[in-house]
Amino acid sequence: MAGFSKVIATIFLMMMLVFATGMVAEARTCESQSHRFKGLCFSKSNCGSVCHTEGFNGGHCRGFRRRCFCTRHC
């Protein structure tokens, strides 16, 4: 009987470990309008390239006026 409770406790501990490592919070993303991008933004890759030169992780086009917004982790 003592061996059975050790097995159950070990299984429970392993399940807790798996669930704890699976629940990782995602970092917040901050964004700022690009200061160097000129014209209308239609290409995410072009926007991202300009944002990289400004020190950001990436960028995307958004809004009715199609502006480039740079993104990074806060």
Swiss-Prot record:
One of its GO terms (biological process) is defense response to fungus. Its main location: secreted. Expressed in flowers and in young fruits. This is Defensin J1-2. Plant defense peptide with antifungal activity against F.oxysporum and B.cinerea. It comes from Capsicum annuum (Capsicum pepper). Monomer. Keywords: Antimicrobial, Disulfide bond, Fungicide, Plant defense, Secreted, Signal.
